[in-house]
Amino acid sequence: IVPSDSLYFRQTGIPGEFEEIPEDQFDRTLDPSYAGEVRENDRDWSAWSPSYASLENAPLSSPDNRRYLQFELRLMSGGLLDKAIIDSVTFSYTIPAIADSVVAEISPVTAAIGEVNRFTYYLRSVFTGNKRGFDTVFIHTPFASTVTGVEINDVAISDYDWEMEDNSLKVIFANDRIETSGQKITVDFESLMTVSGTEFRGRVGDSQSDAFPQRVIAGDASADEEGNRLVVSGEIEEHLFSSVQFSSPVITPNGDERNDSLELDYILLKATSPVNIEVVVYNLKGDIVRRVYDEFDLSGPNKVSWDGTDDAGGTVPPGLYLVRLQADTDAGRNTEIRSVAVAY
């Protein structure tokens, strides 16, 4: 029987108290204030996924290993005489599944924003029947990351390979396949985090077959950890910039390819939507010499270069200059000012 996507409740007579009833006992003829409530069935169905930007070869973002699937298509046309139609919708899947489920959690659940942090990713397998097993772990990371160690059932292994693939750490341990329930996999890695609330989503896969990867479920994967989640919070940080660095305190733009330009490196923090970033060079009188950068950026590392010229393209005279790095956000402006010398 396919579960209904709605649950039905009637009032018990006690204000604010309801009891669940079958749909055929729900009296729709009553005034809504007496009839009860119809609620979304989040007990038997997962929540609706976010909308898909593209359907072509798109992996489902809903939980895996469910018997039934609901989907909703919204058709939009460009005018009154236009009509949108659907020819077909195809879902591809593999049988048997990789596992009944794989539970995962990350530690620590609080990390420094704007710094490379060390994390441990725990996974625990759940098998109850004939499943494929897996030998690959994918961990979605916000930036390129590095694996520093892998353990199977608390024993370190050296026979593994890893690489970055489509914004995910891909770790393969082909000679240590996971095929029984309760096995524990531990992946140690280092990753930059720039936004509080970053989710390190995970999947498991089988490198020895064409089975689709299977998503992990956040939960209690390690008895030694209490987080039971894949979301990492950021330590309190007031600034929007970190690791602001100049390539040199002095530049000599004379064409000899030695310190000809200034390289400004920085990490933008906490920007979950594009933020306007400006880099402007001033002289000591406060006049604008060069507008070097004016773009909308997301969180992460960035590099901006100034070649020692002004807005007209001419080489600036020797002296001391101020470089202003500024972010304009809904909460206000955040500014960093550093000095650089120009000499010949």
Region locations from a protein language model:
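Short loop/turn motifs at secondary-structure boundaries
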Residues: V232-Y344
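Short, compositionally biased P/S/T/A/G/V-rich stretches that sit at domain boundaries
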Residues: V89-A112, D224-E257
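Low-complexity, intrinsically disordered segments enriched in Ser/Thr together with acidic residues
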Residues: L73, L169-D206
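Beta-strand-rich extracellular modules
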Residues: R74-M76, E190-L192, G205-S207, T309, ...
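Solvent-exposed beta-hairpin/edge-strand motifs
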Residues: F138-A156
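Extracellular adhesion/glycan-binding regions together with long Ser/Thr-
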Residues: A47-L60, A156-T186
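Short beta-strand elements of extracellular/lumenal beta-sandwich folds
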Residues: E72, S107-D135, Y266
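Non-cytosolic beta-sandwich-type ligand-binding/adhesion modules
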Residues: I1-I95, S145, Y293
